[in-house]
Amino acid sequence: MKIVVQRVKQASVTNESIHEEIGKGLCLLVGVGQDSTEKDVEAVAKKIVNARIFEDENGKLNLNVQQVGGAILSISQFTLYADVKKGNRPGFTNSKPPEEANRLYEAFNEALCQYGVEVKTGEFGTDMLVDIANDGPVTIIYESQDGKII
């Protein structure tokens, strides 16, 4: 799995059927690759929820999303696995097929919820308008393979 984590002051996702938004927290762009498994879901969810990327009273990155009362906006993003080696049009054969990817994306969101953080989501497999107000900016890419962070 590949997940782009952005610390935000606010973020929202909208399409014809949904509108979800959060205030302070994390916006996650979640990519599910061909080799992604349930072990990756658990490993990366734990790592992200516990990531100390919010400032404490001394300005040091020392607090996680729960400690600041933040929420998570999780958005599926198959384009994170784009192959751009040949030509000018990206290929997406490195992304897991939609049905399997959606299953792991949903499992990932459930894993985040198990840590007691509020999680809102986009709608899998649809075009969406994503509005992100980065805070910092703090942007970190997490990758997991075979249940280990790489």
From Swiss-Prot:
An annotated GO BP: D-amino acid catabolic process
Domain of life of the native organism: Bacteria
Statement: the UniProt record of this protein carries the keyword Oxidoreductase: no
Coiled coil spans: none
Enzyme Commission designation: 3.1.1.96
Keywords, alphabetical: Cytoplasm, Hydrolase, RNA-binding, tRNA-binding
Domain remark text: A Gly-cisPro motif from one monomer fits into the active site of the other monomer to allow specific chiral rejection of L-amino acids.
UniProt-listed PANTHER family: D-AMINOACYL-TRNA DEACYLASE 1, D-TYROSYL-TRNA TYR DEACYLASE
Protein name: D-aminoacyl-tRNA deacylase
